[in-house]
Each structure stands twice: as C-alpha cells, then as structure tokens.
UniProtKB/Swiss-Prot annotation:
Classification lineage: Eukaryota, Fungi, Dikarya, Ascomycota, Saccharomycotina
Keyword set includes tRNA processing: no
Cited function: Required for sporulation.
Keyword tags: Acetylation, Meiosis, Membrane, Sporulation, Transmembrane, Transmembrane helix
Name of the protein: Sporulation protein RMD8
Bridged cysteine pairs (disulfide): none
C-alpha cells in the first residue's frame, strides 16, 4: 500500500491519530481537551488566549458538540461555553488508579490572596477586646449559700438522695435557665445595673427621692436602699413616676416598712461552698457522719496524751483548709422562725392598736385570737421537737382549738409575702455612681434615671457620663421556695424569698462588676492608639513622638491602673459586711466569683503593665537620645570655645606684630 493511498481525500474527515496522554490529572486543573491530534495546537492557542476556566459540575452535566462541528468551526468551539468538555475531564475523578484522581488543593491564585490579606489587615488594625466574663457564654453555675436550705434529705441514704434530687422547683428553674434572651425578658423579672456617673451624693439623693417619689429610703453605709410599691403612678411637678401607696397597718407603718424591719432583724448564716460538691455536701449531711464517728468512738476508745499527735483515724474534724459549713435549719426550725416573726408583727400591731384611739373592740379580739393561735401552735412545735418519752410521742396533743385559726392566719400571711415580692420593686444606689434595679421594667428604669439626671438639686451626680459611655449589667431573677439551693445560672438568680438584705449583698457584687466594665471600656481606645507604636518602632526605629506625648499616654494608663486598684472600691470588701452583717460575706464572695471580678481586674492590670513597660523602654530611649544630643551640644560648645580662643590668639598676634613692626 502506497503512501498516497493512506492520505485522505480533500472531502473526507481526517482520522483521529492514536495518542496517549501521560499527564497527572490531579495537577491539570484547567487541562484542555484534544479530540483531534491535528487540531490540538490550534485549540491550545485559543484556550490560552481566552483564559476561561470551567467548573466541574458543568462539565459533568453538559453534552459536548460533535466532532464534525468542532472541525468545521474551530473558533466557535474555542470560544464557546462547552469548549473544555471532554470524556477525559468528565471521567478524571472516576478512576480506579489513585494517581489519576483529582487532588484537592488549597487555592493559591492571586484572586484569593487579596481577600485573605484584607482579613489579616483588618484583624491587625483592631486590637483584641478585653475578654468578657465567661459566665455569660459558658452557662456557669454557682450555688448561692443560704441559711434557709431545707435539709429534709438528712435521714435518707445516698441512693435515696440521688433518686429524690429532681424537684418541681428545680425543674422549673432549669427550664427558665435555657430560655433564649427575648423569652427571659418577657417571662422573668429584671436585675439591671447602670453606671451613670463617677459618684452620687447619697444624702442629697435621699432627700430628693423622699420628696418627689414619695418613698422611704434607708441608708446602709455606702448604699442607699429605696423600695417602691407597684404599680408605679405618674409623678407630680414634672417628674415622671412615683411610688404607689402601700398597705397601711394599724400602727401607722406601711406593710413594706414592716417587711424591711423583719429582714433587718433576721439572723443570716451563710458559708461559702468551694470546690466540687458531692450530694452529701450539697445537702449538708455532716450530722450523720458525726454521729457515725461518735458510735465508732464509743466502741473503741483510746486515750492519747496531749503531747502526742492524734492518730489518723482520730483527728479533729476541723480543718481550716476545707470549707466550713453552718448547720442548716430543719423544716420545723424554719416554720418556728417564721411563726416567731409573725408573733412579733402581731404583737406590734396589737400594741399600736391599743395605743391608738378610735379602733373597735372587734378588731382587738380578732388580733388577740390570731396571736393566741400563733403562740399555741408555736408551743406545739416546740413540744414536737423536744425529746420526750415514748408515751408522749405516741399520743401528741396539739391545740386543736387554735390549730385551724393559726393555719388560716399563717397561710394568709405567707400568701401576702409571696404576693408582696411581686408587688414591690427595689433600687440600690451606690456612692461610686452605680444604680441597681430589681423588678423594674426597662421603661420604668429609664424614667427613674431621667428624674435623677435632670433634677434641680446641686451636686446630686458627680461627673455624669455621656449616654454612649453608660455601662449596664443585666440579669434575671425569680423567687422559688421549693428550690433545693439558691443559685445563679446563665445570669438567672433564683432566691427563696424577697429578703432585701440578700438582694443588697448581691447588688454589691453586681455594682462592682458594672464599675469594672466602665474601666474596661476606658482602656480600649487607649490600647488601640498605643498598639501601633511597637510596630512603628520595629520598622523605622523611631516612634515619631516627643517625650511629652509619651508621658501623656503612659500617664493615662497609669491613672486607669490607679483608679482600678486604689481609688475605686472594686477590690475592697464593702464596709457593710464588716459592720452590719459579717455573715453575708460568703454570699458576696460567691456572687463576685460568678462575675469573675478578680480575673478581669488581673487581665486589666496585665495589659496596663505590658504597655507601661513598653513606655518605660521608649522613654529611656528618648532620654538616651536627648543625652546624646546634649553631649553633642557640649562638644560643639567646646569646639566653638577653642575656635574663639584660637581666633583671639591670632588677633592678638597680629596686633602685637604690627606694633613691633612700626
């Protein structure tokens, strides 16, 4: 067969030449197809000029043109949408050979680099803000110690404790804890702290609120306590709101004043619970362990001299390194205490009614019957708690005549207390410029702040802050008498009663946290302006600032550090816990640890310390440069003096030479 016989005629289509593509499909991202050997060079040139990259999904779903169309219209094929479609590209990822599979690599194209560079540059421009307290995001749980913890699990074994631990109150609290923020605002009461000024004049504020809002404030050392009766009424004389009228008692005192007096006279016993608590620790079951140890000690008693150390098994139970616990009240003790408070209130009402004139005898008889009912039932409680003989235990004889009356009166007073928690709202005003609201709505809070801000009293607020500089701390709270342990979880405070002394203790820690937030916001712009200086010093070797400018910046940081550690009361324990209620200090510490005040202060001091050290280096370098400049000035002055001396000598020589020549 000759060579001419193998050549195709002009009208025939050229046959495809056999070709083996020895390429790596993983690295050929935009590999073009070559359906015909003779057309490969032209299509490659057109593809390089076009510079078009097609996606893999289009290649797998579209159908390519026929070979005849590709041959007759090569330009249309190179510039069309499906010019890069071939069987090789479609099946490039469906190969059994590992080397033929497409490798996924990170994009290194120039189009992706500017975006990454923009992200990095934007991150470098902004300094990392101060880390917020983790209890806002990590759902931190802190068990608040309280003396009203019912220890009804005390006679149960550990297994029974585990089975009976879930309760209705705790389940309700857990459901509230996991609600979103907008649901909490609608269903739960608010605790909000506002830092609106550098300080308050509490004496002037006492008079202002008493005259305009018709309330009876009380001053506790460095805090002003104000109780409002809900619903609030419109104010008079241009003021926005005022307190509602509280229920009057027979002695002329309001119900809220009696509740406040009762809370102040109540004994509070708290202890801080640290570390990981077991079920026994949570319920304070130390009497069982003590009784068991006493029984074992009675069985095997050995006398140890005083000068010898105690054996390991007979060491004293007191260990100062372990948390100490107060004995919790039993249900009967709680009931007795509440009844005693009711007795005192009823006695006070009876004395006031006897002293006042115009009261009917029917009211006196009713009050006396209530009082006798309370006293009779209280004697029954004492007799039931006192150890007695088996005969007396088997035949108890409660005062049946007064039992029903007492239950009715006691239930009425207890319901009134529970409803009174919802009918009252409270404000705690601290002398360092923080106001803490309890059980107010947001509109009511802003109305009270507006009345205080625009008051006509002089020096009521010391250096008030601008609206954009006001710091807030927001929590939610609820009252639940059935809860096992008062606690705070996910910024929700669960308490058993509306004792304002407990709320005052928690408000101290919340107010200090709000004041610390103000310091954190003050340091942010200072650090942003200072962060550029180390980079400039590393690039150019100079700061471009004078000594006075460096001293001003370092002075701002040092002033902030002094305000945090010395001037403010963030690190100090309030005087209230030293003079009024020392037993409330563990509760204050628990709330303070939840708000992470000590950790935040440490972070603030560390950041200030780093930049102050940098400023010290910069000031030393500037001082060294100034000393070098002064040294050069001295050298120039000495040179000038030498030149002047030489000039004087030369002039003298010339003058003397002229005189001698003449």
């Amino acid at each position: 067969m000759s060579y001419k016989a193998n050549q195709p005629s002009p009208g025939e289509m050229p046959k495809r030449s056999p070709s083996i593509l020895v390429t790596d499909a993983r690295t050929s991202k935009n590999r073009m197809s070559a359906p015909f050997a003779g057309h490969a060079a032209g299509s490659r040139k057109n593809m390089e000029n076009a510079g078009v990259t097609k996606s893999q999904g289009v290649r797998s779903s579209a159908i390519g043109p026929s070979p005849l169309q590709s041959f007759t219209h090569p330009r249309r094929r190179s510039s069309g949408r499906f010019s890069d479609i071939s069987i090789d590209n479609i099946l490039s990822d469906n190969s059994d050979i590992p080397s033929a599979r497409r490798e996924e690599r990170l994009s290194s194209s120039s189009s992706d680099r500017p975006r990454q560079y923009e992200r990095l540059s934007s991150r470098r421009k902004m300094i990392n803000p101060l880390p917020p307290r983790t209890s806002k995001t990590s759902q931190k749980l802190v068990l608040i110690p309280e003396d009203d913890n019912l220890n009804h699990f005390q006679t149960l074994p550990t297994n029974a404790l585990d089975r009976q631990r879930p309760k209705v109150g705790s389940m309700k609290s857990n459901s509230f804890d996991r609600l979103p923020r907008y649901s909490k605002e609608k269903s739960m009461a608010r605790i909000t702290a506002y830092n609106v000024a550098d300080g308050f004049n509490l004496n002037q504020l006492y008079k202002f609120l008493q005259e305009t809002h018709e309330v009876s404030p009380r001053l506790y050392d460095e805090c002003l306590y104000v109780a409002y009766t809900l619903p609030l009424l419109p104010g008079k004389g241009g003021f926005r709101i005022k307190s509602n009228l509280s229920k009057k008692t027979m002695g002329g005192k309001t119900l809220i004043d009696n509740l406040i007096d009762t809370s102040e006279q109540r004994d509070h016993h708290y202890e801080y619970y640290s570390g990981v608590e077991t079920v026994e620790d949570a319920n304070n079951n130390y009497e069982l362990e003590t009784s068991g140890n006493n029984n074992n000690a009675n069985q095997d008693t050995t006398t140890v001299p005083d000068h010898l150390p105690n054996p390991v098994g007979q060491q004293d139970s007191f260990n100062p390194m372990e948390p100490q616990f107060f004995a919790e009240e039993t249900p009967l003790e709680i009931e007795k205490r509440e009844r005693t408070e009711r007795i005192n209130m009823l006695k006070k009402e009876e004395n006031d009614s006897d002293a006042s004139c115009g009261n009917d005898n029917n009211n006196k008889n009713n009050d006396k019957s209530k009082l006798y009912a309370v006293e009779g039932n209280d004697q029954y409680v004492q007799s039931s708690r006192s150890p007695a003989s088996p005969s007396s235990i088997s035949t108890p004889s409660p005062p049946s005549s007064s039992q029903n009356d007492f239950d009715r009166v006691y239930k009425m007073h207890r319901d009134n207390d529970h409803e009174g928690n919802d009918r009252h709202a409270e404000i705690f005003i601290f002398h360092y410029g923080v106001i803490v609201f309890w059980n107010f709505t947001e509109i009511q809070e802003k109305n009270i702040l507006g009345d205080i801000t625009f008051a006509d009293y002089k020096n009521l607020m010391i250096r008030p802050l601008d609206e954009q500089d006001i710091e807030t701390e927001q929590f939610h709270f609820e009252y639940d008498r059935d809860t096992e342990r008062p606690r705070i979880f996910n910024d929700i405070v669960t308490l058993r009663s509306g004792d304002h002394i407990i709320e005052l203790t928690l408000s101290h820690a919340i107010a200090q946290s709000s004041k610390l937030s103000r310091f954190e916001s003050r340091i942010s712009p200072i650090l942003i302006s200072v962060t550029k200086l180390p980079k400039r010093l590393a690039l150019y070797g100079t700061l471009g600032l004078k000594r006075e400018q460096l001293l001003k910046k370092s002075g701002k940081l040092f002033k902030l550090r002094v305000d945090v550690n010395l001037s403010s009361t963030i690190l100090d324990t309030p005087e209230f816990f030293w003079s009024f209620e020392p037993s409330l200090h563990p509760l204050y510490v628990a709330m303070r640890e939840y708000l992470e005040i000590d950790q935040r202060v440490q972070v603030l001091n560390d950041r200030c310390k780093v930049f102050l050290e940098f400023f010290d280096i910069c000031v030393d370098s500037v001082a060294e440069r100034n000393m070098a400049r002064v040294t050069w000035w001295f050298i120039l002055v000495i040179l000038f003096g030498v030149i002047f001396s030489l000039t004087e000598i030369f002039v003298r020589y010339v003058i003397i030479h002229r005189h001698t020549s003449t």
